């Protein structure tokens, strides 16, 4: 039995429409789907005022073909040791996240693996709607660059999600945490490519999905620094038929949201492309998308950096100093040119994510090199004498240019070894920092925007 893709209106229409209008729409949608798929059990009209047992039964029945596990709250208490502080990974806008471990002792057939258990904070920035959005999308979407949802729990007022565990945490943590090991150039391009593939998959699905909240804290990294998109609470179905956009309330994170989306509320796949350009800039510069601790003209990364992306001399000035010049100049120019296109103020001039993938893939072949260093040598003359009559008759400005081809594989292996040694340090930091990873997601809700951090919110 094929699993049909649900929209928000088919699941909780009463959240956004009058009951009569929602019922009419649901009936029409049912007839449409029945004609395509025969007899398929779809969610009845439901809202959160219904008993949770009825809600859980409807949800689990409708997602029966998705292979999601429906966990009990007691089971999740067991695997997290009652949500022990020792297993605490971090906290974000959704709520706290704890590490756990599942195997066939918990449920027959369960693969033994560490997991991240995310608990909805009823007083947090997100709620039932975002929780259900994530369940519905991740139950039906599967790709190497999307985080895997293993199961969920819905008991009384409790809403939990169980994901695969991502040991390297978030890209935000890797780039900006105080004691993080600097990411090598090749690793940064690998992360950019993986995230781009995840977005391209969403945009080119049979029923396209607009991610709407693409940012560094939502890009999680496995042990090999392979990027996976997480947190689908704000995702939306793409426009259908002859529609060019989805009209919606403006939601997202300051510094990442596309300007036309902020101005009009018109959401398209190109909105995600703009956000990707911002993250690519963060990878190039080592700067946050929004940093109010900087001078006013440098606070918004995209506005400050974009004019310099097409000029080689100016580009060198904005590259991340943590790279210490160890990057491919050609690769950096190509990546910067791509970021420039993605950040175009005209949405139609931005590339599709499939084109972004094609541009990024060759950049993995560029090795890490030392950028040119210039050393000025001025000859000294004897006091009261004249300059010697040789090759130094006149003052020279000798430019010594060194280009060292480095073994990128060796450097990455050294970086991974250093990261492994400091993993316990990162784990301790995740427990104590407001920028902690939450399977790993950063606590954007508690960061102070005035101090330069981003904030997930309604964007007015």
From Swiss-Prot:
Residues 83-364 form the Protein kinase domain. It is an enzyme of class 2 (transferase). Mostly expressed in roots and, to a lesser extent, in leaves. It is found in: Cell membrane. Phosphorylated at Tyr-163 and Tyr-165 in the presence of pathogen-associated molecular patterns (PAMPs); this triggers the expression of pathogenesis-related genes. Keywords: ATP-binding, Cell membrane, Hypersensitive response elicitation, Kinase, Membrane, Nucleotide-binding, Phosphoprotein, Plant defense, Serine/threonine-protein kinase, Transferase. Belongs to the protein kinase superfamily. Ser/Thr protein kinase family. This is EPD1-interacting receptor-like cytoplasmic serine/threonine-protein kinase 5D. The lineage of its organism: Eukaryota, Viridiplantae, Streptophyta, Embryophyta, Tracheophyta.
């Amino acid at each position: 039995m094929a699993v049909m893709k649900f929209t928000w209106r088919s699941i909780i229409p009463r959240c956004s429409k009058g009951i009569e209008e929602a019922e009419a729409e649901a009936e029409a949608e049912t007839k449409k789907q029945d004609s395509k798929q025969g007899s398929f059990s779809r969610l009845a009209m439901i809202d959160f005022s219904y008993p949770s047992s009825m809600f859980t039964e409807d949800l689990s029945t409708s997602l029966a073909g998705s292979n999601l596990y429906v966990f009990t709250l007691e089971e999740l208490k067991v695997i997290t040791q009652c949500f022990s502080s020792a297993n605490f990974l971090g906290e974000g806008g959704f709520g706290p996240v704890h590490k756990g471990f599942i195997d066939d002792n918990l449920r027959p057939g369960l693969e033994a693996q560490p997991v991240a258990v995310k608990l909805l904070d009823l007083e947090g920035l997100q709620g039932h709607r975002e929780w259900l959005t994530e369940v519905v999308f991740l139950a039906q979407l599967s790709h190497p660059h999307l985080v895997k949802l293993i199961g969920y729990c819905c008991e009384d007022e409790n809403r939990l999600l169980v994901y695969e565990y991502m040991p390297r945490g978030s890209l935000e943590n890797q780039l900006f945490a105080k004691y993080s090991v600097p990411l090598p150039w090749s690793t940064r391009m690998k992360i950019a490519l993986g995230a781009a593939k995840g977005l391209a998959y969403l945009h080119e699905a049979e029923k396209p999905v607009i991610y709407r909240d693409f940012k560094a804290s939502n890009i999680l990294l496995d042990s090999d620094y392979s990027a996976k998109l997480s947190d689908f609470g704000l995702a939306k179905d793409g426009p259908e038929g002859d529609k060019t956009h989805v009209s919606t309330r403006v939601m997202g994170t300051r510094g990442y949201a596309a300007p036309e989306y902020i101005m009009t509320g018109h959401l398209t796949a190109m909105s995600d492309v703009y956000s990707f350009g911002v993250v690519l800039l963060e990878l190039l510069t080592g700067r946050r998308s929004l940093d109010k601790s900087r001078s006013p003209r440098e606070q918004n990364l995209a506005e400050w950096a974009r004019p310099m992306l097409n000029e080689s001399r100016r580009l060198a000035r904005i590259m991340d100093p943590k790279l210490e010049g160890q990057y491919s100049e050609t690769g950096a120019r190509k990546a910067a040119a791509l970021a420039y296109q993605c950040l175009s103020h005209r949405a139609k001039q931005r590339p599709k994510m499939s084109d972004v993938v094609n541009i990024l893939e060759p950049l993995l072949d560029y090795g890490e090199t030392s950028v040119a260093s210039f050393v000025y040598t001025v000859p000294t003359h004897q006091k009261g004498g004249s300059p010697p009559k040789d090759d130094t008759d006149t003052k020279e400005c000798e430019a010594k240019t060194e280009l060292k081809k480095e073994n990128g594989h060796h450097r990455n292996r050294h970086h991974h070894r250093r990261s492994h040694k400091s993993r316990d340090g990162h784990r301790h930091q995740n427990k104590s920092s407001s920028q902690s990873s939450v399977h790993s997601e950063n606590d954007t809700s508690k960061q102070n925007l005035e101090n330069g951090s981003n904030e997930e919110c309604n964007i007015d």
